[in-house]
Amino acid sequence: MEKKKMSLPVQIVLALILGIVVGLIFYFIGKPEITTNYFKPFGTIFVNLLKFIVVPVVLLSMIDGIISMGDMKKVGSVGWKTVAYFLVTTAAACVIGLVFANIFLNAGLFPTDLALTDGQTWDGATSANFMDTLVAIFPSNMWKSFTDANMLQVIVIALMFGGGILAAGEKGKLAQDLVSSLYSVIDRVMAFIISLSPIGVFTMMTWVVANQGPEILGHLALVLLCAYVGYIVHAIICYSVSASAFAGVSPLKFFKGAAPAMIFAFTSTSSAATIPLSKECADEMGAESDVSSFVIPLGATINMDGTAIYQCVATIFLAACCGMTLTLGQMVTIVVTATLASIGTAGTPGAGMIMLAMVLEAMNIPVDMIMLIYGIDRLFDMGRTCLNITGDISCALCVTKWESKKAAQTAK
């Protein structure tokens, strides 16, 4: 009798659990440097492989998706529905973040007696000009966009080439076949890299737990908990409910289907690196391949719901540390600023911190206060990345259903 092979999602879950256990062992015996020297390098190799494959995956999957749609009108329809979905859920994420932050604050669960030590200053970016970002979206050198892994520019390149191939008609047939062939090759390479996920998850999780143990158990634990409660509630209320209401996928089926990508995103903290798994999960739950090929890469770049919750929680906490009590009007300003900032900083390295700095400036809170939570940013990042890609999958399912209904009505 042939022995049944353990599925990749199960392997990833076991690797995650084992990584936590081994990480705790190294933390409690006081040898976290072992994980830094001997575990993290293998995790870094895995992450490097993911970064290496991200640009060709985004480029070819989006071009292939556009070609598969066969009509730029459909591309436009899918595009505006995707952006609208993300804007609405980002605004909802801000509200959820503010609600739970205020609950924790009023219950006395936030350590508001913290203060900056001498020399603690924030020297990162504090603003991002939307018009500058808009100009930067359009590449002047295609190859530089690829080498810099500028995902917004890669998406624009994909849109232009995909549209160009469709516009060329029969003369573009060779280009269509070339894209399809290259994407098949990249898909195989991608499958091999993803098969290494358990190793990457185990080594990275071991390193994180062993080195971040004090912060997890320390005085910022409740601030971290508040953000994670917000992440979970948002995933249930916005993503699973919308997938159920609009795409007919039950919450249980949705989370079970999205689990491999969620776990992978949690440990890798990279939405872009999770694109292949996110697309696979969405397709298996009923998303059309051409729609998911377009929505997932776009969402990995512009969907920042997890970041929105994080910065709302962080703003309320840091304001309390300054002795400030924010009014309802100021909280509305946070929602508007955070939602617009998610567009203005899309695709920007360190976007989470830039967005938070923008919100703090809008509230007249000293930007240097960021340093109080900067040390555990990776722990926040794990949860917010997981939430972001969950939203990408939900969006792909919803847009697929909306487009199929539209097609059915047109056919009548």
State what each model feature region is:
Residues 312-412:
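Transmembrane alpha-helical segments and their short flanking loops
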Residues 7, 46, 75, 146, ...:
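Residue-level signature of catalytic and energy-coupling elements of molecular machines
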Residues 67-74, 109, 168-173, 181, ...:
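Juxtamembrane helix-boundary/capping and inter-helix hinge elements in multi-pass membrane proteins
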Residues 2-3, 9-13, 20-35, 47-50, ...:
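Signature of multi-pass transmembrane helix bundles
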